[in-house]
A protein has these predicted regions:
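Acidic donor-binding segment of Leloir-type glycosyltransferases
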Residues: 1-15
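Catalytic metal- and UDP-sugar-binding loop of GT-A-like glycosyltransferases, i.e.
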Residues: 11, 40-42
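A short, glycine-/small-residue-rich helix N-cap motif at loop->alpha-helix starts
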Residues: 14-23, 133-134
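Short aromatic/hydrophobic "clamp" motif used to bind/position activated sugar donors
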Residues: 25, 37
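Conserved nucleotide-sugar donor-binding
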Residues: 33-35, 110-124
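Acidic donor-binding/catalytic loop of UDP-sugar-dependent glycosyltransferases
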Residues: 42-57
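Catalytic donor/gating beta->alpha subdomain of glycosyltransferases that bind UDP-sugars
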Residues: 58, 65-91, 119-122, 127-179
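A recurrent flexible, glycine/aromatic-enriched loop bordering the glycosyltransferase active site
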Residues: 72-74, 95-115, 156-163
Length: 179
């Protein structure tokens, strides 16, 4: 089924000094008209209530960038071995209480779900601010934090699920990029 609220935009060019994903996201952002803009990954699965709940949470928390940590779908043997360890390492490096603290902040965001207030996204320069960063999610968190706006990260509790890598080769290259 096609949703009339979704437009598929094709882009066949990317400036040399840009990461491809950032370039594509920037193009999409130029077409966004609402007060909030959401960037997500194609391998995520949303609960029907996720976006509504996320916008309500961002407003309630006065967050200009709200990111959600997905519930990882683990089906392959290598995921069973590595995903729990890798996730634990990420949470040790970026403790949730520090991410969401107003005083001892450690900026972090998860690229699987980046919900921006459109005004903050525009104020920081949008994807131009992170155009060549392979970890644009963390870069965005730092830029938003440095601008004085608030970044918040929440756990998905099953509302956002992700099966990150379809093969062992993509699994290896994906985690190498992160670490």
């Amino acid at each position: 089924d096609q949703d009339d609220r979704i437009n598929i935009v094709e882009n066949d060019s990317c400036p040399e000094d840009w990461a491809g994903k950032c370039n594509a996201a920037k193009l999409g952002a130029t077409m966004a008209t609402g007060d909030w803009i959401l960037f997500t990954d194609a391998d995520t699965q949303f609960d029907v209530e996720l976006v509504r709940c996320a916008v309500a949470s961002a407003r309630k928390r006065s967050a200009s960038l709200l990111s959600i940590l997905s519930t990882l779908t683990i089906t392959k043997y290598y995921e069973r071995i590595v995903q729990p360890i890798a996730s634990t390492c990420l949470l040790r490096n970026f403790p949730i209480d520090r991410i969401n603290s107003e005083h001892k902040t450690r900026p972090f965001a998860n690229g699987q779900f980046l919900l921006f207030s459109k005004s903050t996204y525009d104020d920081i320069g949008g994807h131009d601010a992170v155009k060549d960063d392979l970890l644009e999610d963390i870069a965005f968190a730092k830029v938003v934090h440095q601008s004085g706006a608030k970044v918040q990260v929440l756990f998905a509790d099953g509302l956002l699920k992700c099966s990150m890598y379809p093969s062992y080769a993509t699994f290896q290259s994906g985690w190498k990029r992160i670490y």
